[in-house]
A protein has these predicted regions:
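Conserved G1/Walker A P-loop phosphate-binding module
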Residues: 1-111, 139
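C-terminal-of-GTPase-core extension/linker across diverse P-loop GTPases
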Residues: 2-6, 11, 17, 146-260
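Helical mechanochemical/support elements of P-loop NTPase systems and associated helical scaffolds
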Residues: 31, 35, 48, 61-67, ...
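Conserved Switch II/interswitch segment of TRAFAC-class P-loop GTPases
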Residues: 40-45, 72-82, 93-155, 168-182, ...
Length: 260
């Protein structure tokens, strides 16, 4: 599985990536610190695999892996090429699911591209750029279908789906919330590889002080949770900076931070 870590500049994407992969990707207090996507592959521990290996005397044990892609910060106008946006959007299109990092902490030492902390505005900014990119994909598909359907009536169903999808996205809705009429439409929709159709989980990046109650006292986290619930997505609370510091410890030191 390949997961893409996305968000605005300076929200903690590369810091989270480093905590997950120990890759040491650059993270700094300025926009577009990441330009080319950083990629890290993390094995998924599974005790059952060890048991099976012993039972069958396996010479080699290959665990499942998750590939994380740290994608450079998106900005308003990314779908039109702002901030190297087209390149970044194409990187997102290659992943299976999206981890959307949203900043829910105050820190005057870390600049925010819009000047203040507002995670819902940040989410809307990213989602709009994904929507615009999807609409461009659908427009090109629609133009091709209009020409092809004249000689192949079997494409009528796909053309109808594309037109309904275009209207749905133009109204500001995400493709993942589109209701298909049958299994064939579901397969067609998946084949379009739309960004807003990909499963999304929101990573609410908080300060260390907010970890004790899992962000329950943080108003910004509450807003993200409410938004995600309406969208049908999940939220997890993390202090990416602390997680990165823990990831850099040796194995013995890490044990005191692990919850069983």
């Amino acid at each position: 599985m390949k997961l893409g870590i996305v968000g605005l500049p300076n929200v903690g994407k590369s810091t989270l990536f480093n905590s997950l992969t120990k890759a040491g990707a650059e993270s700094a207090n300025y926009p577009f610190c990441t330009i080319d996507p950083n990629v890290g592959v993390v094995p998924v521990p599974d005790e059952r695999l060890d048991v099976l290996a012993k039972m069958h005397n396996s010479a080699k044990v290959v665990p499942a892996v998750i590939e994380f892609v740290d994608i450079a910060g998106l900005v308003k106008g990314a779908s039109k090429g702002e901030g190297l946006g087209n390149q970044f959007l194409s990187n997102i299109r290659e992943v299976d699911a999206i981890v959307h990092v949203v900043r829910c902490f105050e820190d005057t030492n870390i600049v925010h591209v819009d000047g203040n902390i507002d995670p819902l505005r940040d989410i809307e900014t990213i989602n709009l750029e994904l929507l615009f990119s999807d609409l461009e994909i659908l427009e090109r598909r629609h133009a091709k279908l209009v020409k092809s359907v004249k000689g192949d009536k079997s494409l009528t169903k796909e053309l109808d789906l594309v037109e309904r999808l275009q209207k749905f996205l133009e109204d500001g809705s995400l493709a993942k919330n589109f209701e298909v009429v049958d299994e064939e439409e579901e397969k067609l929709l998946a084949s379009f590889n739309l960004l807003t159709y990909k499963p999304t989980i929101y990573a609410a990046n908080v300060s260390e002080d907010d970890l004790a109650d899992d962000g329950a006292s943080n108003e910004q986290v509450a807003k993200v949770r409410e938004y995600a619930k309406k969208e049908g997505s999940e939220v997890f609370v993390i202090c990416a900076q602390i997680e990165q510091e823990i990831a850099e410890l040796d194995d013995e030191e890490k044990k005191m931070f692990i919850l069983y």
